[in-house]
Swiss-Prot record:
<dbReference type="InterPro" id="IPR008254">
    <property type="entry name" value="Flavodoxin/NO_synth"/>
</dbReference>
<feature type="binding site">
    <location>
        <begin position="70"/>
        <end position="75"/>
    </location>
    <ligand>
        <name>FMN</name>
    </ligand>
</feature>
<keyword id="KW-0285">Flavoprotein</keyword>
<keyword id="KW-0288">FMN</keyword>
<keyword id="KW-0028">Amino-acid biosynthesis</keyword>
<comment type="pathway">
    <text>Sulfur metabolism; hydrogen sulfide biosynthesis; hydrogen sulfide from sulfite (NADPH route): step 1/1.</text>
</comment>
<dbReference type="GO" id="GO:0005829">
    <property type="term" value="C:cytosol"/>
</dbReference>
<dbReference type="InterPro" id="IPR001094">
    <property type="entry name" value="Flavdoxin-like"/>
</dbReference>
<comment type="similarity">
    <text>In the N-terminal section; belongs to the flavodoxin family.</text>
</comment>
<feature type="domain" description="FAD-binding FR-type">
    <location>
        <begin position="236"/>
        <end position="450"/>
    </location>
</feature>
<dbReference type="GO" id="GO:0010181">
    <property type="term" value="F:FMN binding"/>
</dbReference>
<feature type="binding site">
    <location>
        <begin position="521"/>
        <end position="522"/>
    </location>
    <ligand>
        <name>NADP(+)</name>
    </ligand>
</feature>
<feature type="binding site">
    <location>
        <begin position="153"/>
        <end position="162"/>
    </location>
    <ligand>
        <name>FMN</name>
    </ligand>
</feature>
<feature type="binding site">
    <location>
        <position position="601"/>
    </location>
    <ligand>
        <name>FAD</name>
    </ligand>
</feature>
<dbReference type="InterPro" id="IPR010199">
    <property type="entry name" value="CysJ"/>
</dbReference>
<dbReference type="GO" id="GO:0070814">
    <property type="term" value="P:hydrogen sulfide biosynthetic process"/>
</dbReference>
<comment type="subunit">
    <text>Alpha(8)-beta(8). The alpha component is a flavoprotein, the beta component is a hemoprotein.</text>
</comment>
Length: 601
C-alpha cells in the first residue's frame, strides 16, 4: 500500500518519524490499519493529562473474538450486527472471518462467539472448513480457560439442519470451554431469532467484562475491521435491473436446460469481482399460485397480513412465500393441522418426513392429502421467499455494466404434472428480455483469483460450476496475466452439453487457457467424471501444485465436491509420497493459504 504524503511542513511528524511509521505499516492489511487507527484513537481519548507509556492496561480487558463462518452472507450479516452491538456496549471485540482466523491461537482466547452457517449435508461453511477440521483433530487443545457461545444458521429443508453450529457448540464444550449461552439454531427466517440472541449475548458478555476501565475505549474500535460495502444496493434493497439476454446454451437433445443470462446494470455503479455471486429475487409462477389456492378451496382474494401489510392471498403467495421447496416441518405441521391419514403416520419419523419433503413439492402434498384451510392458516405453514444466489460468470473488465450468470433450469414431473424450480424457471421462462429483475451482489472473498498474475490456476467446474471460471478467464485475459490456466470440465454429452464451447476454444487458441481436460459421462459405456480426469493427469497436476498453483472447485457440494477432493487427496498422496492422512493435512494447509478454494452448493 502506498500513500502520497502531504508537504512536510504540514506534518506533525519529522521526516525520521514519518519514515519509521511508513516502514512499520507498509505491509499492513486494511483490517490491521483499521485496528491501529482505533488503538491510537483510544490512546488519544484517555482522560486529560494521562501519560501513555505503553498499552499495558489494554491486556486487562478480555477481548471477545467473534468468528463469522458464512456461506451465503447471512452469518456474516448476523456477526456484523453483533459486532456493532458490542461496540455500542463499549466492549472490546475482534470480528474475524473463519477463513482468516489463526485457529491455533484458540487456546489463548478467553471469550469466543461463533456465528456459523451450514452447507451441503451438514458441512461447515467453506471458509470454516480448516477451523472445523482443526477442532476435530488430535491437535485441538484443551480450552479450560475459554467461554463461548454459538449461533447456528441453516435451512430446515435439509436433513442436517444447522449441523455446523451444532458441531462447533458440542466440540468447544467437549474441549473444556464454558458455554455462556445455549446454542440457537435459526432457519432461513433468522432475523428475529438473531436479534433476540444478540441482545442476550451482549448482556451476558457485559457481565463478564470489567466496567469503567480506560482500556475499553482504547480497544473498542478494533471490532470495526470488516470492509464495508459502499453500494446502496443490498439483499434488503436490491437493484431493479433489466434482463437483456436469455440464451439456451445446451443442445436441442440435451436432458438439461442451461441458460446464459445477461443482466444490464445500467448506470447503477454496482461493482463485483470474479468469484462473487449474484443474488436474484424472484416471483413464484402465477399458475402454481392458482393451483395451490384452488386445491385448498380458496379464492386468492382473501386478505392476509405480511410483515405488517395487508395483501390479497394470491399476491402474497406470488411475491413473499416459498412454494417450490418443501420441508419436514411443513409436512409435519400440515399433517397435524389437517389430521391427514396419509401424513400423520410420518410424524415422529424424521427420516420419512425428510424423504417425503424432498420428493413431494408443497402443491403436490396438498393434492395428495387434500384439506380445506383458511388463508391465514396457509400463510402460517409457509416460509418466507428468499433470493437465490448464482455464481457470476463474467468480469467487469470485459462486460462493464453487465453481469452474466449460468442458470440450470430445474424441471421435473410429479405424476405427469410439470414442476420447476422457483428462481431458475423465473429467469428461464417468465422474465422477458428487457424485463425487470431485482438483484444484489453477494461478495465472496473466499473465492478469489491469486493476487500475483503469474500464479498458475487450476479450475475444476463440471456442469454450471463452469460459471465463475468464465469470469476468471475474462479477468486474466483482460489483465494479460502471464500465469498458466488449466480447466477441468464435465457434463453428460460433448455435442449437447459443452457449455461456452466456442469461448474455451478461443482461449486455448489465444494461449490464455493453457490446457483443458474434458469428461463426458454419457458418451461411452463407462462413465467418466472430472475426478477421473484428475487422477489421469495426476503427475502433471502435482507438478502444477508444487509450482504454486491455486486450486478452485465449483459446483455440487453433495457428491461432486467430495469426489473431487478425494481424487485430489489420492493424487497428492501418490505423487507427493505421502499417506492419505498427511495428504489431508497438506490440502488443509493449501486451504489455509488460500490456494485451495471452493464455491460449492
Amino acid at each position: 500500500m502506498t500513500t502520497q504524503a502531504p508537504p512536510s511542513n504540514l506534518l506533525p511528524l519529522n521526516p525520521e518519524q514519518l519514515a519509521r511509521l511508513q516502514a512499520a505499516t507498509t505491509d499492513f492489511s486494511p483490517t490491521q490499519l483499521a485496528w491501529v487507527s482505533g488503538y491510537f484513537w483510544g490512546m488519544l481519548n484517555q482522560q486529560p493529562g494521562a501519560v501513555v507509556n505503553a498499552p499495558a492496561t489494554a491486556v486487562e480487558i478480555p477481548a471477545i473474538t467473534l468468528i463469522s463462518a458464512s456461506q451465503t452472507g447471512n452469518a456474516r450479516r448476523v456477526a456484523e450486527a453483533l459486532r456493532d452491538d458490542l461496540l455500542a456496549a463499549k466492549l472490546n471485540v475482534n470480528l474475524v472471518n473463519a477463513g482468516d482466523y489463526k485457529f491455533k491461537q484458540i487456546a489463548s482466547e478467553k471469550l469466543v462467539v461463533v456465528v456459523a452457517s451450514t452447507q451441503g449435508e451438514g458441512e461447515p461453511a467453506e471458509e470454516a472448513v480448516a477451523l472445523h477440521k482443526f477442532l476435530f483433530s488430535k491437535k485441538a487443545p484443551k480450552l479450560d480457560g475459554t467461554a463461548f457461545a454459538v449461533f447456528g444458521l441453516g435451512d430446515t429443508s435439509y436433513e442436517f439442519f444447522c449441523q455446523s453450529g451444532k458441531d462447533f457448540d458440542s466440540k468447544l464444550a467437549e474441549l473444556g470451554a464454558e458455554r455462556l449461552l445455549d446454542r440457537v439454531d435459526a432457519d432461513v427466517e433468522y432475523q428475529a431469532a438473531a436479534a433476540e440472541w444478540r441482545a442476550r449475548i451482549v448482556d451476558v458478555l457485559k457481565a463478564r467484562v470489567p466496567k469503567d476501565t480506560p482500556a475499553q475505549a482504547a480497544n473498542s474500535a478494533s471490532g470495526a475491521v470488516n470492509e464495508v460495502s459502499t453500494s446502496p444496493y443490498t439483499k434488503e434493497e436490491p437493484l431493479v435491473a433489466s434482463l437483456s439476454v436469455n440464451q439456451k446454451i445446451t443442445g436441442r437433445d440435451s436432458e438439461k436446460d442451461v441458460r446464459h443470462i445477461e443482466i444490464d446494470l445500467g448506470d447503477s455503479g454496482l461493482r463485483y469481482q470474479p468469484g462473487d455471486a449474484l443474488g436474484v429475487w424472484y416471483q413464484n409462477d402465477p399458475a402454481l399460485v392458482k393451483e395451490l389456492v384452488e386445491l385448498l378451496w380458496l379464492k386468492g382474494t382473501e386478505q392476509v397480513n405480511v410483515e405488517g401489510k395487508t395483501l390479497p392471498l394470491s399476491e402474497a403467495l406470488q411475491w413473499h412465500f416459498e412454494l417450490t421447496v418443501n420441508t419436514a416441518n411443513i409436512v409435519e405441521n400440515y399433517a397435524t393441522l389437517t389430521r391427514s391419514e396419509t401424513l400423520l403416520p410420518l410424524v415422529g419419523d424424521k427420516a420419512k418426513l425428510q424423504h417425503y419433503a424432498a420428493t413431494t413439492p408443497i402443491v403436490d402434498m396438498v393434492r395428495f392429502s387434500p384439506a380445506q384451510l383458511d388463508a391465514e392458516a396457509l400463510i402460517g405453514l409457509l416460509r418466507p421467499l428468499t433470493p437465490r444466489l448464482y455464481s457470476i460468470a463474467s468480469s467487469q473488465a470485459e462486460v462493464e455494466s453487465e453481469v452474466h450468470i449460468t442458470v440450470g433450469a430445474v424441471r421435473f414431473d410429479i405424476e405427469g404434472r410439470a414442476r420447476a424450480g422457483g428462481a431458475s424457471s423465473f429467469l428461464a421462462d417468465r422474465v422477458e428480455e428487457e424485463g425487470e429483475v431485482r438483484v444484489f451482489i453477494e461478495h465472496n472473498d473466499n473465492f478469489r483469483l491469486p493476487a500475483n498474475p503469474e500464479t498458475p490456476v487450476i479450475m475444476i467446474g463440471p456442469g454450471t460450476g463452469i460459471a465463475p471460471f468464465r469470469a476468471f478467464m475474462q479477468q486474466r485475459a483482460a489483465e494479460e496475466a502471464p500465469g498458466k490456466n488449466w480447466l477441468f470440465f464435465g457434463n453428460p454429452h460433448f455435442t449437447e452439453d459443452f457449455l461456452y464451447q466456442v469461448e474455451w476454444q478461443r482461449y486455448v487458441k489465444e494461449g490464455v487457457l493453457s490446457r483443458i481436460d474434458l469428461a463426458w459421462s454419457r458418451d461411452q459405456k463407462q462413465k467418466i467424471y472430472v475426478q477421473d480426469k484428475l487422477r489421469e493427469q495426476g503427475a502433471e497436476l502435482w507438478a502444477w501444485i508444487n509450482n504454486g498453483a491455486h486450486l478452485y472447485v465449483c459446483g455440487d457440494a453433495n457428491r461432486m465436491a467430495k469426489d473431487v477432493e478425494q481424487a485430489l487427496l489420492e493424487v497428492i498422496a501418490e505423487f507427493g509420497g505421502m499417506d492419505i492422512e498427511t495428504a489431508d493435512e497438506f490440502l488443509s494447509e493449501l486451504r489455509v493459504e488460500r490456494r485451495y478454494q471452493r464455491d460449492v452448493y
